[in-house]
Amino acid sequence: MASLGAIGLCIALVLSSYSVIGSFLGKSIKISALEESARRAVYVLLLVVFVSTVSLVTAFINRDFQVAYVAAHSNLAMPNIYTWVAFYAGNEGSLLFIALALAVLSSIAIRLAPARSRETLAYTVGILMLVETFFLAVMIFMANPFDTLPLTPSDGEGINPLLTHFGMFFHPPALMSGLIGLTIPFAFAMSSLIGKQSNDEWVDAGRTWGIISWVLLASGLLLGSWWAYTILGWGGFWFWDPVENAAFMPWLALTAFIHSIMVQKRRGMFRMWNIVLINVAFALALYGMFMNRGGPVPSVHSFGASDLGLVFLSFLAAGILIPFLIFFWRFNSLKSTQSLDSMLSREAAFLLNNLLFLGIAFVTLWGTVYPLLSKLGSGEEITVARPFYDQVNGPLMLLLILLMGIGPLIPWRQANLASIKRALLIPTMVGTVSYTHLTLPTICSV
C-alpha cells in the first residue's frame, strides 16, 4: 500500500502541473480544448490523491511499521478509533490531508462556478492547481508520508497522548480545510484581475467560498478551544498561543471580507478594498501553515521542529509579492462605481467594522512575531503574554461589539442622527430592562 500511495502522489504532481500549464497556456492561446482538459485533470487528481489517502489510512489500520510515518505516530496498543487522528498527527500526514482538502474543494468550486466567473475559470483552475502543486512537491521531495524504514520495528512510538481527545477528530481537519479553503476565493479574485474583468464577476463565488472557509475556520477554532480547556489545563479556552493566533488572524480578515463584499455586491463599492482583504486573509492563512511547520515561534500546537519552515516562508513571500504585483498592475480597474455618500451610513459602518477587525489582526500579529523581532534585534527573546493581548485587543473588541449592535440599524447611503436615535430607542430600552433584571438580584443581595 505504501508503494501505491507514493506512486499516487507522483501521478498527482504530474496532473497538477499539467493543469497549471494547460489552464494558463490554453487561455493565452485561446484553445478551449486545452482549458477543458486542464479542468478535467483536477477531477482525476482528486481521485488519485484520495487513493493515496486511503493507502496511508490502510497502512495505519494494518500497523505497517515499515512506513516511517506509521511507526512514528501509532503502535500496537493504539485503538483503531484513533487511526484518523494519527493520519494527520504529523507534518507528512497533515500535508496529505491539506492536498486532499484542496483537491476536494477545488473540484467542487470548478464544477459549481457561477456563470459570471466562467470567462476566467481557466485562471482560477491554474491558481488552485499551482497551490496544489506546491503541497504535492513538498510531500514528495521533503516530507513523504510513504517513506519506509530500512528495518521494520516490532512496534511503533505511539500517538501523542494529547491527541486522544474527541475534539481531535474534527478540530485539525476543520482548521486545515478552512485555511486551505481560502485559496478558493483568493483564486477567483486573482483570476478576475488577470482576466481584466470589471472586477464584479468574482463576487458571488468569492463570497460563497469565503463563508464556507469562515465556517470551517470558526468550527476549528471553537473545537480547538474546547480541546485546550479540557486537555492542556490552562484554566481557560484561549491562551493567545502563536499557532492559535495564526489561525485566528485569517478568520478576522475573512470576517471583514465577508462583510465588505456585501457592500460591493449591493452598491458596487469597496472593489479595491475587497481585493486587499482577500489577499490579506490568504497571506495570513499561509502564515498559519508556516507557523505549524517549523515556524520560528514555538507553540504547543505546532508539529514540532521541521526543515519545512524555510520552504513555507518562501511560499508565503511569493503568496504576498505576486498578488501585490497583480494588484498594482490592475490598480486603475479597481475604482468603485459608487462613492461613500455619508459617514452616517451602513457602508461607513461596514468600513469601520473592517478596520476594527484588521486592527485586532495586526495587534495579534505584532504580539506573535515580536519575540522573534526582539531576538533578532537585541539578542533577547521577550515573551508576549496574555495581558498584552487582553489590554490592547480588549477595547477594540468592545468597540466591535458596540458597532455590531448599531450597524444593522443604520440605513444604506445616508442617515441622520434623528433616524439613528429612533432606531436605537427600542433596543436600548430592552437592553436596559434586561440588564437591570439580571443584575438587580445580585445588587440587592450584597
Predicted regions, residues:
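Polytopic transmembrane helical bundles with strong interfacial aromatic enrichment
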Residues: 1-406, 412-413, 417-420, 424-430, ...
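Single conserved hydrophobic/aromatic residue that forms the stacking wall/gate
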Residues: 437-446
